Structure formats: C-alpha cells, structure tokens
Amino acid sequence: IIGAGYIGLEVAATAVQKGLKVTIVEMADRVMNRTVDPVISEYFDNLHRTNGVEIFLESALERFEGESGVEKVICTNNKTVEADGVVVGVGILPNQEIAESAGLKCNNGILVDEYGRTEDHSIFACGDCTNHPNFYMKKNIRLESVHNALEQAKTVALSLMGKPEKYNQVPWFWSDQYKDKLQIVGMSGDHDETVTRGSIEAGTFMLFYLKKGELIAVDSVNNPKDFLISKKLV
C-alpha cells in the first residue's frame, strides 16, 4: 500500500483481516501525518504493526517493476518490496477542469461562497472539489470528507429552492481500523495546549486541543459516547 493516510490504513486493516500480508510505504515520518497529532499516529502505527503490517516510513515510491503486472515496488531509499497487488492512496487533486473550461475561478478546487455559488451565481458546486469559506476555520478550505459533502449538498439544494442558508458546519471525520474507531471534530494544528483524557495504553482515550483556552478540536479513540458530547462543545 502506497500511503499511510486514512485510505491506506483502512485498506491495510481490511486486507489483514482477510488474511493478506501487507506492507505500507509512506514518505512522511509518521502515519496520518497531515491530519492527526503524533500521539494518534503512534497509537495507530503500533496497532498496525501489532497486527503484522510492515510499515516503511520516510520511504517514497520510485517505480514499479514487473513483467505482466506489478511484482516489485522500488522505493527511493533503496528498499524493495515484493508485491502481487498494489493500492495507491496518496491524496487527490480536485476535478475542476469543467469549471475552468466554463471560465469559473478555481484555486485548489472550485471556488464557491457560503451558499455553494460559484463566481457565476447560476452555477453551484459542492463536495470534495470545492474550496469554500468556513466560519469555524475563519478562512477558505477544501475538505475531503463524507460529512462535508453531505452538508454542502444540503446547502446547495436549499439555494436552488430559493431558501438559501449559509453553510455553517464544524468539520468532523471518522476512521474504522480493525476494531478501533477514530473520531475527529474540528481541526487541530493551530492549538497551544493539549489535554489527554482516558488511557492510551487501554486503547480508550481522547485528546482535547485548545487555543487560548478555547476548545478547537477533539480526537477520540474508541469513545463514541463522549465524542458525541465533545462535538457540541467545539
């Protein structure tokens, strides 16, 4: 598996449970590097290694080799992985070509306002391909998540029916790996304090991220009830 983000790790967990031998190649220095705190990365790294997954960190893909299909994965640090199947999960680029051809403004996605309208107010867009204003982040962002796609679709539908309501959602995400559930509300990274609740060793814990005393994000592992409460506090 190329990439140790949500997709790569979820596929790895499923493959292991189907009895397959799995190797992950990741160019960053930890799993889920772009989206979670190092504490969460370490927990899920250990979880996968405990389940028999081989993980090569700081290893970038150089090329594939094979006669009739992929037989070897060659990495830039001289590591070679024997393989009879490869899954690539390294992120996406938004499909914005149709918008560009229509003369609409794009910048890491199709630019829309809080009602889902593009530069041409007769054209709307929603989902992973849009770059939209987010009141919580206080800036424009492009999100790749089920929740965002669903809620943006509702916003666009209301606009089309002449009942416009501003998109007003705090981002949240989840990932199921083996029997473990990771749930996230808000986006950490800009915090100045972290509070841990529960037991990392027991596999049931939460990380609360604060900025100037205000709760801005929560990461929850195997604690769905408390997570539902936390969603209301961010």
Language-model segments: which ranges?
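Mid-to-C-terminal Rossmann-like scaffold of FAD/NAD(P)H-dependent oxidoreductases
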Residues: 129-226
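FAD-site-proximal beta/loop scaffold in flavoenzymes
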Residues: 68-74, 80-158
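Beta1/beta-strand and adjacent pyrophosphate-binding region of the FAD-binding site
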Residues: 1-5
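Hydrophobic alpha-helical segments, especially N-terminal targeting/anchoring helices
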Residues: 25, 74, 112, 209-211
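Rossmann-like dinucleotide-binding cores of NAD(P)H-dependent redox enzymes
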Residues: 6-63, 145-148, 169-177
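Active-site- and interface-proximal helix/loop "cap" or "latch" segments in soluble metabolic
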Residues: 230-234
